[in-house]
């Protein structure tokens, strides 16, 4: 306190604020540092160093400068807290900046351990800072079951790219686990390690692997991961997902769980879907999912089957067909579940908004028509 008084006597307010800033920074007292940084910003702008609710309203220029200065203060305090391992507190300051990639870089520098694991996962997944990294921590430290729950309750509500990242991790993890389990059983039974690499190769001509009570991985996990895999884009991971269906379809009937349309018969229908995305059996897959879509009453059964069909057409580079299917099968005002691109997104993909304009005119959708008109002439 005496040193502060001496600092104030020697240099006034500015000297005191500088000294306090250095002190709190050296002591890693970042909440207090933030308060000092706020005072410095306000003093620089000629404002009282402590906010007064009765103060006059600021003009736009000063208000913008104040906001910029406060954001810089948030950045310094939040970065310090993160580097000190105080993850939730650091994120509290860094959230207003909107710089998620910068925060992700900082978070990845923090070694994960028992003391901070839950905080890391919360900020990365729940707060959306780095969902892929956070999900990898869940998978590594809490296992498959908890990862599936996290995917269902949190990841599935995030943007498609984040879903893909997490789904790829789960597919790779489960495929590796199942492959190892199968190889161990085969080696024990046959007296030597199998030469086959893929799951399909391991299970073909080995019917003895599949008895009434026999399985080599949690079958509920398998069904869930195959379902999640439908968002996957990369060829290598799609092939792993297809490989998982080769095992699943050979399981005893009691482990063949009923799925939701259009994947009621989970493994055969999923296999057909993955094959189409890999450029195989495209016509057969499109025919199958078209029949499922056409058999659906959107008002009473929901739109999932229709959306899966539209999305499959799009992913198989049949976007014009997807546009026509969307127009024909999803009447105006239909509530969708977000599995397929919208008519606007499909039109933008092909660079042609003519059909969208026609439909919007017919349905007296003024906003949709105007949007398509402006995009067409942009």
What feature does the model see in each segment?
Residues 1-95, 102, 107-378:
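Long, low-complexity, acidic Ser/Pro- and Gly-enriched intrinsically disordered regions
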């Amino acid at each position: 306190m005496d040193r502060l008084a001496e600092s104030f006597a020697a240099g006034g307010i500015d000297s005191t604020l500088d000294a306090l800033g250095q002190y709190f920074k050296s002591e890693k007292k970042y909440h207090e540092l933030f308060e000092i940084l706020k005072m410095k910003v306000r003093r620089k702008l000629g404002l009282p160093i402590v906010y007064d609710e009765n103060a006059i309203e600021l003009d736009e220029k000063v208000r913008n400068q104040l906001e910029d200065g406060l954001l810089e203060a948030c950045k310094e305090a939040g970065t310090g807290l993160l580097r000190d391992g105080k993850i939730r507190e650091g994120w509290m300051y860094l959230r207003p900046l909107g710089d998620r990639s910068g925060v992700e870089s900082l978070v990845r520098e923090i070694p994960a351990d028992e003391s901070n694991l839950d905080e890391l996962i919360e900020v990365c997944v729940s707060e959306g800072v780095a969902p892929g990294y956070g999900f990898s921590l869940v998978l590594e430290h809490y296992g498959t079951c908890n990862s599936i729950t996290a995917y269902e309750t949190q990841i599935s509500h995030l943007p498609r790219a984040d879903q893909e990242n997490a789904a790829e991790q789960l597919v790779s993890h489960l495929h590796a686990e199942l492959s190892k389990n199968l190889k161990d059983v085969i080696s024990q039974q046959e007296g030597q390690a199998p030469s086959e690499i893929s799951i399909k190769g391991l299970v073909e001509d080995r019917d003895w692997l599949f008895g009434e009570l026999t399985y080599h991985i949690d079958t509920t996990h398998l069904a869930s991961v195959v379902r999640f895999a439908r968002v996957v884009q990369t060829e290598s991971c799609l092939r792993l997902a297809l490989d998982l269906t080769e095992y699943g379809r050979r399981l005893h009937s009691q482990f063949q769980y009923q799925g939701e349309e259009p994947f009621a018969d989970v493994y055969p229908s999923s296999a057909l879907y993955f094959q189409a995305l890999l450029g195989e059996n495209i016509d057969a897959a499109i025919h199958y999912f078209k029949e499922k879509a056409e058999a659906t009453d959107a008002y009473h059964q929901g739109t999932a089957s229709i959306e899966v069909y539209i999305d499959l057409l799009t992913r198989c580079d049949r976007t014009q067909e997807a546009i026509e299917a969307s127009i024909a099968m999803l009447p105006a005002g239909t509530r969708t579940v977000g599995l397929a691109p919208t008519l606007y997104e499909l039109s933008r993909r092909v660079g042609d908004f003519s059909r969208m304009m026609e439909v919007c005119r017919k349905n007296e959708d003024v906003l949709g028509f105007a949007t398509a008109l402006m995009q067409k002439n942009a």
